[in-house]
Amino acid sequence: DALGNRNSLLHGGWDDWPWHGIALGAHVARLFSILLGATTVVFAYRTARLLAPRQRAAAVLAAALVAFTPQFLFISASVSNDNMVTAVCAAGVWLSVALACGRVTLRWEALAALGLLVGLAALSKLSGLLLGPFALLCLGLAAWRGRAQGQSWRLLVGGGAVILGVAASVAGWWYWRNWQLYVDPLGLSA
């Protein structure tokens, strides 16, 4: 049938409990995907708490909107790279907002963690590259907040270098490989 993208799996005796081989691998991968979906919901809640600290109901609503979106539930229960990029981006958005709001100290450890999240997002899926500009924008807001101490340029340049350096060390090899193979770092011409 040409309607929709219907994925199917043939079931047989090899799929019975106790799982082994491919069936075990598929169930482990689905469990990992479900954990990534739960991570996304947790970070949606935590980000909403940062943005509206006195309104716990808003954070619960934000988490519920994510958790009970039918397509999110469907994808979270399947094996897909979408689960990794949403979980990593949700954590990256939370950390970026926490830095911008001053809830997390602008230390190199936090900036390196944000760079790691940006790199993992960029490695998981092409749309994960968008976490990088958001993280740098939030770093800019944090630097602007620190301008009273005369640190704004140092924070912006140094922090940006840490974030981009760690992100490049995590994901840069993939884009370099694409450039070498396809003369296209995004691999869109392959």
Regions found by a protein language model. Name each.
Residues 2-17, 44-68:
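Transmembrane-helix signature of polytopic, membrane-embedded enzymes
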Residues 29-36, 64-68, 72-96, 108, ...:
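Multi-pass, polyprenyl lipid-linked donor-dependent membrane glycosyltransferases
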Residues 31-52, 91:
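Transmembrane-helix motifs of polytopic, lipid-linked glycan transferases
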Residues 60, 95-119, 124, 153-154:
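Short hydrophobic alpha-helices at membrane interfaces in multi-pass membrane enzymes
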Residues 71, 112, 116-144, 168-176:
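Transmembrane helices and adjacent periplasmic/lumenal helix-loop junctions
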Residues 100-101, 131-165:
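Perimembrane helix-loop-helix junctions
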Residues 158-190:
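Membrane-lumen/periplasm interface segments of specific transmembrane helices
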